[in-house]
């Protein structure tokens, strides 16, 4: 069916007033490309679930695409039941527009299919969903979130019984089930209140959240308590309750919350891109820092799985990168656990192929087996699962992604800004007793192991034409691999689609350059972007940064 025919079908079938208004606005715009973009494909379900722009259409996040996906999941769960009791589902949602509506839509569809769901009664962080899926023994977890995307987006992440985002085999099976569902005629549903009354939609009790916070607290390091002043912003998301509770539990009570970003608000009125990686999102927090002079600024993204920090350096506040915080945390956790006698024999840490190489000498310093996996925290969770199968999960000490995601402990199998915030504050308190802040501590590591600079440059390609351009860029690199970049010889070209080092196939290309420099290119798994990762090494910070500028300019030529 072509886009205009699909549009006409939706006009006939849709009864939701907001979606009806959206459909009407499309027609009144007089721009056929608007209709085409909303209907040229069905929102793709993958290992990251669904993610897309809110609105009417098959390529949009709405109650019909959510209903279709949930019906597919219900069919998958019931198909696994083998005439027994079907598995249950844990459901969580963030502060985004329609997140609660989509969570209740999912619970209603599951209920109509005879499947019980456990739903958080209020918004909670992503790691609380990963934990609840495991704690409640659920077959599937559903988290309605689009992480740190702009406000026009929402998403629908799916987790397996281990608390990890689903593997490709399960995603493929669910996709097959979804594709056989007509989103208007085949989706079984019932009112959420009726699902509750029938005992099929059950609110998660407070004891589950308490158990999650207990598990987070178990990862604290023993240290002398001392004063620490923190400015914290949840960026209008889910982090406020859990982060402040865990900080108070470790004795950090001097917490100044950024008022205009404290309440859940899916419009994200203070920053269009609520991403703790970027300075714009932290400007309100930095303004408060100028008034109260804290030891550090903490910022969690809307679903509180990522955390960014800033600390004072001279007259300004410096943002530390995800790689820098990951290296600092690895060093701190290993140092403290070694001093406390709790570092396990043959400890294991995990990061991804796009994270800094600076972790390698730091890990070696403590005798840590540093493992690298593909991008996506589920692969870090997979290493934990492998250790668990060998009855060795206590060997896992830390995992991180360069995109500001960290995990200590095995209570969750996704990145956890709650446990990371706790450990960052403990780390800041430790260095404060030495007369340093975290920025200064990072400079010490650079001086010890060399100045590594890492930079991620993203190129956006919207719509159907953008998807074709992204595919063309990757095909071009494969068909004619670069022999040099900005005059630096490519010493090794790796195509992860062919399998590298025993890792699963992935649409990632790596160019290893002379003198320890590197460029990696991959399409984002959650946004219409191509990401270029730059890794440079220099005898000074400025030298490494200048080289990254040169490589960035050279790669920009190909992003058209």
Where are these regions (language model features)?
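Phosphate-binding and adjacent anionic-ligand microenvironments
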Residues: 290, 294-296, 316, 336-522, ...
């Amino acid at each position: 069916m072509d886009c205009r025919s699909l549009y006409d079908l939706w006009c006939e079938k849709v009864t939701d007033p907001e979606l009806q208004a959206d459909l009407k606005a499309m027609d009144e715009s007089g721009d056929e490309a608007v209709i085409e973009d909303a209907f040229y494909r069905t929102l793709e379900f993958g290992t990251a679930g669904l993610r897309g722009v809110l609105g009417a259409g098959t390529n949009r996040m709405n109650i019909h695409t959510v209903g279709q996906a949930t019906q597919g999941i219900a069919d998958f769960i019931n198909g696994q039941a083998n005439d027994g009791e079907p598995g249950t589902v844990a459901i969580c949602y963030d502060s985004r527009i329609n997140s609660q509506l989509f969570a209740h839509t999912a619970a209603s569809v599951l209920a109509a299919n005879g499947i019980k769901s456990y739903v958080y009664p209020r918004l909670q962080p992503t790691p609380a969903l990963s934990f609840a899926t495991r704690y409640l023994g659920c077959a599937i977890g559903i988290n309605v979130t689009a992480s740190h995307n702009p406000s026009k987006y929402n998403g629908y992440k799916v987790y397996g019984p281990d608390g990890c985002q689903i593997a490709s085999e399960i995603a493929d099976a669910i996709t097959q089930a979804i594709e056989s569902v007509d989103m208007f005629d085949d989706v079984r549903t019932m009112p959420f209140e009726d699902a509750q009354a029938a005992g099929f939609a059950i609110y998660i009790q407070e004891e589950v959240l308490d158990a999650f916070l207990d598990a987070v607290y178990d990862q604290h390091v023993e240290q002398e308590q001392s004063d620490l002043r923190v400015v914290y912003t949840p960026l209008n998301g889910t982090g406020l309750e859990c982060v402040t509770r865990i900080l108070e539990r470790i004795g950090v009570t001097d917490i100044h919350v950024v008022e205009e970003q404290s309440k859940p608000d899916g419009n994200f009125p203070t920053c269009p891109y609520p991403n703790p990686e970027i300075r714009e999102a932290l400007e309100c927090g930095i303004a408060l820092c100028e008034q109260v002079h804290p030891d550090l600024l903490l910022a969690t993204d809307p679903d509180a799985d990522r955390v960014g920090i800033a600390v004072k350096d001279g007259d300004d506040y410096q943002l530390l990168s995800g790689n820098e915080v990951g290296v600092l945390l690895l060093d701190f956790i290993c140092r403290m656990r070694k001093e406390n006698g709790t570092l396990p024999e043959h400890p294991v840490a995990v990061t991804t192929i796009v994270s800094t190489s600076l972790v390698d000498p730091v890990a070696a310093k403590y005798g840590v087996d540093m493992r690298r996996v593909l991008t996506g925290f589920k692969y870090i969770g997979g290493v934990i699962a492998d250790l668990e199968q060998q009855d060795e999960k206590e060997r896992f000490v830390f995992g991180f992604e360069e995109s500001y995601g960290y995990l200590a402990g095995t209570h969750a199998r996704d990145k956890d800004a709650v446990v990371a915030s706790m450990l960052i504050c403990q780390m800041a308190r430790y260095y404060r007793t030495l007369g340093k802040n975290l920025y200064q501590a990072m400079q010490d590591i650079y001086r010890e192991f060399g100045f590594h600079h890492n930079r991620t440059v993203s190129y956006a390609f919207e719509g159907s034409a953008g998807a074709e351009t992204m595919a063309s860029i990757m095909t071009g690199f494969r068909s004619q691999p670069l022999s040099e970049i900005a005059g630096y010889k490519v010493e090794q070209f790796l195509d992860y689609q062919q399998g590298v080092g025993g890792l699963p196939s992935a649409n990632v290309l790596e160019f290893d350059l002379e003198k320890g420099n590197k460029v990696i290119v991959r399409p984002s798994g959650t946004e219409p972007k191509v990401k270029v990762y730059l890794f440079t090494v220099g005898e000074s910070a400025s030298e490494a940064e200048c080289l990254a500028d040169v490589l960035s300019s050279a790669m920009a030529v190909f992003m058209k």
